């Protein structure tokens, strides 16, 4: 696992520094670092009720195995909480390592080595090359620099469907009149 940001503990220090001073570390902040943007959410989980393949259940069970409360397996609107979520994320990292995986922080993929139309390596931080024929990218939506490199290399990308919501606020009197008529 190559993570452009820092581990969750050091990332928290960078985020707190930003909140206190306004000084942004562009590689370790609310968007980038171990756990992604969700690490600084309030830990509400999307249950994906229409998840016919059961992937969400697997994710929730994995969270429970790493310290999340069992209630998230059956609650309608499961919630972990920010502080506990950070511990869960760190626990998952340690399991990856215990199973022989390598997790590297401050390891930004800055280029892709392509030979004869095939991936042969990744360039990390503009200097180190890691030989590989396969890479699974999970850059999140804020890694525009990564998307630019993919585009510059003419590597195929497929957009993910998304939905945008909005909130409209109305005066209470207007809502009451709409719901209950003139007698409201």
Task: Give residue spans per PLM region.
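Residues forming the flavin
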Residues: 1-40, 44, 48-61, 66-184
């Amino acid at each position: 696992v190559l993570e452009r940001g820092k581990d969750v503990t050091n990332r928290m220090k960078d985020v707190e520094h930003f909140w206190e001073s306004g000084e942004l570390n562009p590689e370790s902040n609310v968007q980038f670092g171990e756990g992604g943007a969700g690490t600084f959410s309030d830990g509400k989980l999307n249950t994906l009720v229409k998840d016919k393949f059961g992937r969400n259940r697997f994710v929730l069970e994995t969270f429970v195995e790493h310290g999340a409360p069992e209630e998230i397996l059956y609650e309608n609107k499961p919630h972990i909480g920010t502080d506990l979520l950070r511990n869960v994320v760190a626990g998952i990292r340690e399991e990856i390592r215990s199973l022989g995986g390598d997790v590297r922080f401050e390891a930004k993929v800055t280029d892709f080595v392509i030979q004869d139309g095939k991936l042969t390596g990744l360039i990390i931080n503009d200097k180190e090359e890691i030989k590989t024929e396969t890479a699974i990218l999970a850059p999140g939506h804020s890694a525009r620099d990564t998307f630019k490199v993919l585009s510059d290399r003419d590597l195929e990308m497929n957009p993910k469907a998304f939905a945008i919501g909005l909130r409209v606020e109305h005066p209470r009197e207007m809502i009451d009149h709409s719901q209950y008529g003139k007698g409201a």
